[in-house]
Each structure stands twice: as structure tokens, then as C-alpha cells.
Design a protein with these regions (language model features):
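C-terminal lid/capping helical subdomain adjacent to the catalytic/cofactor pocket in oxidative enzymes
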Residues: 94, 98-149
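Active-site substrate-recognition segment that forms the wall
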Residues: 1-102
Length: 149
């Protein structure tokens, strides 16, 4: 698992602000709206645990939004932010018990899909931990796929 760095900019609401979430697919920009403002978010940067903000990445968010939104930036940027997403080398989450480490379970490596996969991940782990038959085959997600031997 390695960090994938995603960026966002949160703005105060302009007079003409988005009212619904938007995905600007051609520019890979997501817009999250609420009453007092909106957020532009996206990008994936593999830079280890570098804690700096990349101005080029932030500018790309604003350029992408400018192509689609009447007012692509609010009157004031409240926050310019990054967060690390757990990325798995094979782009498949790691879910299940860790071989040779009794009681240690993993649920990581979801990348940009963490929130969307959270309910399914929770259900799969709950089923495995309690001995219930899971609704899906857990083998593709097993930490054992990385075991040497």
C-alpha cells in the first residue's frame, strides 16, 4: 500500500454557485456543493509522504472547473488541502485476515473508491469475522495474495 495524494479547494459560495454535486469527467474534477460554499476535488499524485501542496495540481482543478462553471472559484478560498488515499499496487483493496498473524485483519487499499466501497467492505469483513458465508468470493481481496512462498 502506498499513498496517493488527492487535492481539493474549498470556496465560500459565490452568487451563482453549484447546487448539486457534479463530476466534470473530461477534466476529472468533482464538485461538491452545500449552502455556504463548494469544493473542487480530484487528482492523483504519487509522491510518497510529501506534505507540500503542489500549486500546479491546484491550478489544474481551477482550470478544469473554469471550463464548465459560470463562477469557477468562490469569492474566497477557505482551504487548499490534500489528503492521502491508500493505494494498492494491484488496484484491488486488501480485505481479510493477515496470514500468520491471528486476530489481525486489513481493510485498506481502496484508493479513490473508499467511501463508495465502505458498506460492502464492512459487510464482507463482518461476514468473515463472524463465520457467515459472504455474498461474494473474498479470495481476490485477501491479504494472502501477497504472501511469499
Amino acid at each position: 500500500v502506498q499513498p496517493g495524494k488527492g487535492y481539493s479547494i474549498t470556496y465560500d459560495a459565490p452568487a451563482l454557485a453549484p447546487r448539486r454535486p457534479l463530476v466534470l469527467r473530461e477534466r476529472s474534477v468533482c464538485v461538491t456543493a452545500w449552502a455556504s460554499g463548494f469544493r473542487l476535488g480530484s487528482t492523483m499524485e504519487f509522491s510518497g509522504f510529501d506534505a507540500s501542496l503542489n500549486a500546479r495540481r491546484l491550478a489544474a482543478l481551477e482550470r478544469g472547473a473554469a471550463e464548465y462553471l459560470h463562477v469557477p472559484a468562490g469569492p474566497a478560498a477557505r482551504e487548499r488541502w490534500y489528503g492521502w488515499r491508500p493505494m494498492c499496487v494491484d488496484d484491488v483493496p486488501i480485505l481479510g485476515p493477515v496470514p500468520q498473524h491471528d486476530g489481525l485483519w486489513l481493510a485498506t487499499g481502496h484508493g479513490m473508491m473508499g467511501m463508495g466501497m465502505s458498506a460492502g467492505t464492512g459487510q464482507l469483513l463482518a461476514d468473515l469475522m463472524t463465520g457467515r458465508a459472504p455474498a461474494i468470493d473474498p479470495a481476490p481481496y485477501s491479504p494472502a495474495r501477497f504472501a511469499r512462498g
